[in-house]
């Protein structure tokens, strides 16, 4: 890839890369329309963990063939949520193996009687391996958490005499192995003087709790039997016009017509097209800008697609509306450009994590987090260390929060994790990530891994292949991974478009010595930039802080130490910010749960907010910095105003 001049991925406008996906079928977000219905299955499910020694009792006794309550005692389990923190059973919190969920559903009669209707079961995520049965029939399997999967169950609900209720059974195994993402190992403790026979532990190589279960929504939705299966959109700018290139996939018939209309925010039609692919030109287009970068950020159009088809059962129609943000992304050797303007990431790393619900999706928590991001003046975050719920990305699109979209490639710490089976799975996961998230304007870069052992020769080949595969899937966005390796030893850095670095000076290194941060940070930046000539993001930095701990002069774990550490980092960042450093993402937005260890007191405490989303002292420091940066980088240059209520306790 050429350096020195902007590499504008949007220049691939007519190239519709969706067809490069190896997966069969699209993964459009289920929505209601004139032709589509949805029935959410959130709420209480029956739940049972298989505590048998071999964790196989559920399969041996075929729990899926009859109501789960007939197999033995069950619990009420809320969906979505992680199962770990719901009960008072300590065994369940750290359970490794198969758990079983079940829900009985009554379908609308028209879903079962109308043969024009296609009925689909969709699971938002199931960590990590899932098998699904409908009325005892093996319907679907999926490997990997954090991403949706679905199955057409029309043939199970529209054929023959139907039971009064539809019984959905889902078995989930959260075991991590050397070939899962994230990877892990199972260690058997064979010393029978210390451990019972068959005792084992799950070893993980990442610093967050391995929550599991049905952590996102489960739902049923319908489409016509001939339907819009997928839409791929890329955008560009030509002089003062916006370009929207689209490709539409249809399944169920070869005899159909397609109409595409682009509507502005006032629901006025600004462009029309027909056929499965085309380009819509929007004179004087309103571009999608990040939050605080423009007076009118996050402008969204709507691409309305109408399908009409002739089938053996008669004419059918299908309708789907896709939000579209017109924007470009480009990278030079020292800048990250959005719509041709230098963009500086001033934001956070996050986790999907909260009390009780674990990694379960929660609307109040989502809205609270976005209010805090806006109050903070943050314009970006990384989905550390896995793809977040689709609803999160939709909020980012609407609010202008830029996203580095990361796959679950975290914990790749051992040589045995870089094997061909893992590589194949990793590439497939990237296909699923791109398929799901490709149309979000907020997503400006893919991250294929966090802190892999990238000094290994095997890791170099592995990362090269995953990055190349991701670029082939989506030429419209840059690709990176997040490194904590030495600049001279990193085997994956030559293949990324942007260097992302994690470093914890005066915390994990030379802890307590705040006076060393500026020198060490400057050395880090200069070494990496001299070798690779690529823009750099400080993708992690921070300090563990127990809310309410105070000491002056600052000592580790106090709020004063976290503030002082951030101040020293900021001085170092400012020395390079106008040169080739293009972003800073604090670790972390909020405290989060981890496995128990001697260095973790009820989880990781590096958040600038507590797990309950209350601010530590550093939150106010970071807020002051981010609003200052926002006013320096805004286009056009008008003063940004703090987004908080007049009576906010944070003002």
Swiss-Prot record:
GO terms for biological process: carbohydrate metabolic process; glucuronoside catabolic process. The active site is at 451 (proton donor). Gene3D superfamilies: Galactose-binding domain-like (2.60.120.260), Glycosidases (3.20.20.80), Immunoglobulins (2.60.40.10). Keywords: Glycoprotein, Glycosidase, Hydrolase, Lysosome, Signal. GO terms for molecular function: beta-glucuronidase activity; carbohydrate binding; signaling receptor binding. Pfam families: Glyco_hydro_2 (PF00703), Glyco_hydro_2_C (PF02836), Glyco_hydro_2_N (PF02837). PROSITE patterns: GLYCOSYL_HYDROL_F2_1, GLYCOSYL_HYDROL_F2_2. It is an enzyme of class 3 (hydrolase). It catalyses: a beta-D-glucuronoside + H2O = D-glucuronate + an alcohol. It comes from the Eukaryota. Its EC number is 3.2.1.31. One of its GO terms (cellular component) is lysosome. Glycans are attached at residues 173, 190, 272, 420, 631. It is found in: Lysosome. Inhibited by L-aspartic acid. Residues 1-22 form the signal peptide. InterPro entries: Beta-gal/glucu_dom_sf, Galactose-bd-like_sf, Glyco_hydro_2, Glyco_hydro_2_AS, Glyco_hydro_2_cat, Glyco_hydro_2_CS, Glyco_hydro_2_Ig-like, Glyco_hydro_2_N. Plays an important role in the degradation of dermatan and keratan sulfates. PANTHER family: BETA-GLUCURONIDASE. Homotetramer. Belongs to the glycosyl hydrolase 2 family. This is Beta-glucuronidase. The lineage of its organism: Eukaryota, Metazoa, Chordata, Craniata, Vertebrata.
């Amino acid at each position: 890839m050429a350096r020195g001049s902007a590499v504008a991925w949007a220049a691939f406008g007519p190239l519709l890369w969706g067809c490069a996906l190896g997966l069969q079928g699209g993964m459009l977000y289920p929505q209601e329309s004139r032709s589509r219905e949805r029935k959410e299955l959130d709420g209480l499910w029956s739940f049972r963990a298989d505590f048998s020694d071999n964790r196989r009792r559920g399969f041996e006794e075929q729990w899926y063939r009859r109501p789960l309550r007939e197999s033995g005692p069950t619990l009420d389990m809320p969906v979505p949520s992680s199962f770990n923190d719901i009960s008072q059973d300590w065994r369940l919190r750290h359970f490794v193996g198969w758990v079983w969920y079940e829900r009985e559903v009554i379908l609308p009669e028209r879903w079962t009687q109308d043969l024009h209707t296609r009925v689909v079961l969709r699971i938002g995520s199931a960590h990590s391996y899932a098998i699904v049965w409908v009325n005892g029939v093996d319907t679907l399997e999926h490997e990997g958490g954090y991403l949706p999967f679905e199955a057409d169950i029309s043939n199970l609900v529209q054929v023959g005499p139907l039971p009064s209720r539809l019984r959905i059974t889902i078995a989930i195994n959260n075991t991590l192995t050397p070939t899962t993402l994230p990877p892990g190992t199972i260690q058997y403790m064979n010393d029978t003087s210390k451990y019972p026979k068959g005792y084992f532990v799950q070893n993980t190589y990442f610093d967050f709790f391995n929550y599991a279960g049905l952590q996102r929504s489960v739902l049923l939705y319908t489409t016509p039997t001939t339907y819009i299966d997928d839409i791929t959109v890329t955008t560009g700018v030509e002089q003062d016009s916006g370009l929207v290139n689209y490709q539409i996939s249809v399944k169920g018939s070869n005899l159909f017509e397609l109409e595409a209309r682009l509507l502005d925010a006032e629901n006025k039609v600004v462009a029309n097209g027909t056929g499965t692919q085309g380009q819509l030109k929007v004179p004087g287009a309103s571009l999608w800008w990040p939050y605080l970068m423009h007076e009118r950020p996050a402008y969204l159009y709507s691409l309305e697609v109408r399908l009409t088809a002739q089938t053996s059962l008669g004419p059918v129609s299908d309708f789907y509306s896709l939000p579209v943000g017109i924007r470009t992304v480009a990278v030079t050797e020292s800048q990250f450009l959005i719509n041709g303007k230098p963009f500086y990431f001033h934001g956070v790393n996050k986790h999907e994590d909260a009390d009780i619900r674990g990694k379960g999706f929660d609307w109040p928590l989502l809205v609270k987090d976005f209010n805090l991001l806006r109050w903070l003046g943050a314009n970006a975050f990384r989905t550390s260390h896995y793809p977040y719920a689709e609803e999160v990305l939709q909020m980012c699109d609407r609010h202008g929060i830029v996203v580095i979209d990361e796959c679950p490639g975290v914990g790749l710490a051992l040589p045995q994790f870089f094997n061909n089976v893992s590589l194949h799975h990793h590439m497939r996961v990237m296909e699923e990530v791109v398929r799901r998230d490709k149309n979000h304007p907020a997503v400006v870069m893919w991250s294929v891994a966090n802190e892999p052992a990238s000094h290994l020769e095997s890791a170099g080949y592995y990362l090269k292949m995953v990055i190349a595969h991701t670029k082939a899937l989506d030429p419209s966005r840059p690709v990176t991974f997040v490194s904590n390796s030495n600049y001279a030893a990193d085997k994956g850095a030559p293949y990324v478009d942007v260097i992302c670095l994690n470093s914890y000076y005066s915390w994990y290194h030379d802890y307590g010595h705040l006076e060393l941060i500026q020198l060490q940070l400057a050395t880090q930046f200069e070494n990496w930039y001299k070798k690779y000539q690529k823009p750099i993001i400080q993708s992690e930095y921070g300090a563990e802080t127990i809310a309410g701990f105070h000491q002056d002069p600052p000592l580790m774990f106090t709020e004063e130490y976290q503030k002082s550490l951030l101040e020293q980092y900021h001085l170092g960042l400012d020395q390079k910010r106008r040169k080739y450093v293009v972003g800073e993402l604090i670790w972390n937005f909020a405290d989060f749960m981890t496995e128990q260890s001697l260095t973790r007191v009820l989880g990781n405490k590096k958040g600038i907010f507590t797990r309950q989303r209350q601010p530590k002292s550093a939150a106010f420091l970071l807020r002051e910095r981010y609003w200052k940066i926002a006013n320096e980088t805004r286009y056009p240059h008008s003063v940004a105003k703090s987004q908080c209520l007049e009576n906010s306790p944070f003002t």
